[in-house]
Amino acid sequence: MADKEAAFDDAVEERVINEEYKIWKKNTPFLYDLVMTHALEWPSLTAQWLPDVTRPEGKDFSVHRLVLGTHTSDEQNHLVIASVQLPNDDAQFDASHYDSEKGEFGGFGSVSGKIEIEIKINHEGEVNRARYMPQNPCIIATKTPTSDVLVFDYTKHPSKPDPSGECTPDLRLRGHQKEGYGLSWNPNLRSCLLSASDDHTICLWDISTVPKEGKIVDAKTIFTGHTAVVEDVSWHLLHESLFGSVADDQKLMIWDTRSNNTSKPSHAVDAHTAEVNCLSFNPYSEFILATGSADKTVALWDLRNLKLKLHSFESHKDEIFQVQWSPHNETILASSGTDRRLNVWDLSKIGEEQSPEDAEDGPPELLFIHGGHTAKISDFSWNPNEPWVICSVSEDNIMQVWQMAENIYNDEDPEGAADTEVQG
């Protein structure tokens, strides 16, 4: 009986999702300046823009690149580098190019040929997460379904993978007992990598001292303060010895690598009422960070007084797995997760007065809801070169590259585009 009810619930949910998607598609020309939807061969659990951009002469687009991965059904997995053509500001937009079937928009008409897979490198099992080293973006670290963290220099691998399927990373980083997701390169110290694991620990490697023989590097330090699965880890963006971690023990911990005590963090705070899945330090303000949780909220913190939560962002209907500050705007951050939505928040709007109608849509700081995905969002990334452009990937193979309409984030609109809180 329960099976029948579950099947009925699933069917109802699927119908609701499809209806919502149809509405979203119809509204994209009003809500976005750009939407590109691309079906990947396999879903990617990870997405990160590379920092480089090329602007071909005489063309009305620029070429950006992404680090992706695969999550296959028992077939060969790959670490993937893809290229994406984004239209320039002066590209000739033509409303007739709106593809209502796909909900694609932005003067480009069809996306075919605009997103291409450039490099595929054999990988052991799915790519849980992949992140490039800021000081040398050719170096990419990956989290695997095993306890190993792999490091690839993609310039040393052919762009087409060896048909044997053999995975030949340039380094294997050892120290964990189980798999995990969290991965963070130190932006201020070259070659220093942190990783979070289901084994309750955080490992730190320095890959500048590469072994003479073999490819195995053992962890330099193992941090053991958490009492449950460590979900995410992140270096502070300005202080080379500080990092934060979050875990299923509901705690946010701040660590200092200069301390000799690897089992006790500098600060530990009960951050949420459920598992804490992600964290992000603000790139502009050295004291501010955000955490995202299974309690459906994003929390805002000040390192100077962690006893007091600055703010709680509430609108998500399910677990939050990603939170990322905008690289271009100090007050903007985005979050995503199981509810298939990516929310963009603006701190500067916290506490603004709202009409009752607006309040029904969400709090004033909720700037935008991206509703283009019909499955759980696995990861997203802010484009470092094009403000307000985001790439998001979901469990149903879909990758979307999108930019909300300018009148939503630009308050200078004389026609009073004050009703900026829109739902995709």
Swiss-Prot record:
The yes or no answer to whether the keyword Oxidoreductase is present is no
Source organism per UniProt? Danio rerio (Zebrafish)
User: WD repeat ranges?
Assistant: 32-125, 126-175, 176-223, 225-270, 271-314, 315-371, 372-404
Keywords, sorted A to Z: Acetylation, Cell cycle, Chaperone, Chromatin regulator, Chromosome, DNA damage, DNA repair, DNA replication, Nucleus, Repeat, Repressor, Telomere, Transcription, Transcription regulation, WD repeat
A Gene Ontology BP annotation from the UniProt entry: DNA replication
Similarity section: Belongs to the WD repeat RBAP46/RBAP48/MSI1 family.
Quaternary organization: Binds directly to histone H4, probably via helix 1 of the histone fold, a region that is not accessible when histone H4 is in chromatin.
Gene name for this UniProt entry: rbbp4
Where is this gene product found?
Answer: Nucleus; Chromosome, Telomere
Q: What is this protein called?
A: Histone-binding protein RBBP4
Q: Gene3D superfamilies in the record, alphabetically? A: YVTN repeat-like/Quinoprotein amine dehydrogenase
Q: Cross-referenced InterPro entries, in alphabetical order?
A: G-protein_beta_WD-40_rep, Histone-bd_RBBP4-like_N, WD40/YVTN_repeat-like_dom_sf, WD40_repeat_CS, WD40_repeat_dom_sf, WD40_rpt, WD_repeat_RBAP46/RBAP48/MSI1
GO terms of molecular function: histone binding
